[in-house]
Amino acid sequence: MAMDEYLWMVILGFIIAFILAFSVGANDVANSFGTAVGSGVVTLRQACILASIFETTGSVLLGAKVGETIRKGIIDVNLYNETVETLMAGEVSAMVGSAVWQLIASFLRLPISGTHCIVGSTIGFSLVAIGTKGVQWMELVKIVASWFISPLLSGFMSGLLFVLIRIFILKKEDPVPNGLRALPVFYAATIAINVFSIMYTGAPVLGLVLPMWAIALISFGVALLFAFFVWLFVCPWMRRKITGKLQKEGALSRVSDESLSKVQEAESPVFKELPGAKANDDSTIPLTGAAGETLGTSEGTSAGSHPRAAYGRALSMTHGSVKSPISNGTFGFDGHTRSDGHVYHTVHKDSGLYKDLLHKIHIDRGPEEKPAQESNYRLLRRNNSYTCYTAAICGLPVHATFRAADSSAPEDSEKLVGDTVSYSKKRLRYDSYSSYCNAVAEAEIEAEEGGVEMKLASELADPDQPREDPAEEEKEEKDAPEVHLLFHFLQVLTACFGSFAHGGNDVSNAIGPLVALWLIYKQGGVTQEAATPVWLLFYGGVGICTGLWVWGRRVIQTMGKDLTPITPSSGFTIELASAFTVVIASNIGLPVSTTHCKVGSVVAVGWIRSRKAVDWRLFRNIFVAWFVTVPVAGLFSAAVMALLMYGILPYV
């Protein structure tokens, strides 16, 4: 059959296929390196370079088998024997519908499934062309089932692996020995799965036809050699690196403790009475007496009683005014009487009282000290700023947030917060005492006008309920330095593995219809008996990489950071288990969604780490998008198919 008159559709198909590959790279690239970028083991530029290499390699070696499912497994191509041009127009329509919806989703930073798009688009044009009889519904049912199986299976595998790692490595007092013992196993498992995938799926491309047992034996042998190499060279090097890092951090910690001890010995803990501090009866209220007394006193406090320090109380503002700084470096809140009858003051950092305060808090801590109060002490010592020690004296809660991206401003923002009050002074000059006093004054006035009870964060909860230590929550969200080193390169390796699997699976979403279009044009029929050309797979890989570099960062933010915090240890389990699921599915020719596998793994591991770590609202939106994608892509494809069938083909 002469097909030259339809050459225009082939040319149009190549253009649209590249746009479709671009959209796949812009949206689905977050499945490969999103978690690696989110955990900080690679930068965005490094992720793009690595992904470009492994996406292209995976598309060439693994993409052929899944491409066959996309081309011939969803619709019955034999029904188009007499209307070849209709099938060609349908393939073009499928690519247009899928590309348009994925570009829209990428613009909206919404991670969707490229597999969903192409399947929905294929069904859409078939319904317009020959109705429901053109769809192989049983194959569609299997594909739909895989959409649910893939996140559940990937999530289960990731969760199981993470639980084992947490029990045997992360929760140990010294995680290094077990971590080093497990490194060869982790590397061997990663390499074995990767080699098996290449040998099994890519063997025909490489000109190798081997039985299953031979492929398994080769994969196992390569994995053993790699494990031996890791045990012989990588583990000793990693042990030396971790030991050196821990020794360096230990030395810095000792220097910090010695500095504090010298400060405490240099000043005797004698607190002076502050002028300008008045109680309701106009009598002067001293900040404190001897070292054993509290920071605030009242008439109701009997001699010899020692209430806890002010930073451990729930305090409320009733009335008062703010005075300007006093010459001796103090700052008085004249008449600020709290609900407990105490009067509290702000002192200057250079007045000498700050050192006494440090000593007071240090000796006031007992073995029964609550975790939240312990956290306040660490916060005070770490920040050494006006905000922190004022919080300790005046009962104002402090939430310190540091922007790692701005190394020049490690104390970029500190907030004074109440139940409904939030005051933030960006880039506050802590060496300027007056600017700090203004910040405190504004927070106090805001609390006065709103009638808000100002409380310490440690006292906001019910005192009868067990308190959660913010420091412990932060520790739970981050890996220890030695654990970070153990899993750093391992997550990079698994991310490359995931990118390889992504290229093998998702290149078919972009190139499957183009391959069908090309083979129909070359053979003059719909049978498509020839193998998938390698150069077409490479063409799709180039398009995916282009989309990654231009627009990939938009969805990386959603997958790598917004859904749940990622650490190297959790990222490793997410990458390995989800990539394993995708590779297995690719090898059996089942078009699973890499988005579903990765989302399932991220949510499962995040939920196991902490019930509060997962953004369930975002997960709900993603879950809804899974169902919306198929009909929306189908509608776009059906509209284009109707235009081609009834508006263009009859006149060509």
Swiss-Prot record:
Which segments sit on the Extracellular face? 1-5, 68-86, 131-142, 212-213, 504-530, 587-593, 643-652
Compartment(s) where it occurs, according to its Swiss-Prot or TrEMBL record = Cell membrane; Apical cell membrane
Effect ascribed to mutating N194S: In IBGC1; uncertain significance
| Comp. bias regions, Polar residues | 295-304
**Tissue localization of expression:** Ubiquitously expressed.
Q: Would you kindly state one Gene Ontology biological process term found in this protein's UniProt entry?
A: positive regulation of bone mineralization
* Keywords carried by this UniProt record: Cell membrane, Disease variant, Glycoprotein, Host cell receptor for virus entry, Host-virus interaction, Ion transport, Membrane, Phosphate transport, Phosphoprotein, Receptor, Sodium, Sodium transport, Symport, Transmembrane, Transmembrane helix, Transport
Subunit details: Homodimer.
The name of this protein is Sodium-dependent phosphate transporter 2
This chain's source organism reads Homo sapiens
Gene (UniProt): SLC20A2
